[in-house]
Amino acid sequence: SMWSNLKYALDKMGYNPGERLVSILTMAHMYGLAFELIYPFASGTHVYFISKTPAPKIINEIFSAVRPNLIVAVPLIIEKIIKHRVLPQLEKFHIKLFLKIPYLNRRLRLSIRDKIVNAFGGRFKLIAIGGAALNFEVEKFLSSVQFPYTVGYGMTECGPAISYDDWHTFKAGSCGKAVDRMEIAINSSDPENIVGEIL
């Protein structure tokens, strides 16, 4: 399954030699090991390791200095940045007012997206999120500003990716589609329409 995940990443994620990735996740976790060490190593991506606890302030400093092309993260990191730095700004009276005007709404949302992209270094292709469920409020916001993110699902025993989708085709609220060479069954009386556990 490690080989299958590596082949999938090399075939579908499209990162090139010399591009940059900041390693936020622990190497003791399969998600971090696979997608912040093995995949970047195989694709020739430069990996920058954070030697401190990845607090939002430290992450912001490192992203500004390294300007990564790929960001692999757990939801907690993204949620902290969005909940503490972005969502409070949207509660201001004039911002709420502008968001109710169709033309200004779109322009303001694109401006907000650009600011968030810059907060993550300004040149990444996407943020791949996994390891836990993404907060609904944060995901709804990211989708509304057309932020380049995707959410995958996996477990250690599967090497670790089970599902993933490119951010252009990713549907908010999902965890992507089954990765190549992976078979998935949903434990549900109606797996097409009723939520169930992935087996």
Name each model-derived stretch:
Residues W3-R20, M27-K115:
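Conserved AMP-binding/adenylation subdomain of ANL enzymes
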Residues R20-S23, L199:
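Short, well-ordered beta-strand segments
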Residues S23, S64, L99, K125, ...:
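A near-ubiquitous, low-amplitude feature marking generic local secondary-structure context
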Residues I24-M27, A42, A133, G152:
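Alpha-helical architecture
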Residues I71, L108-L199:
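Conserved AMP-binding/adenylate-forming
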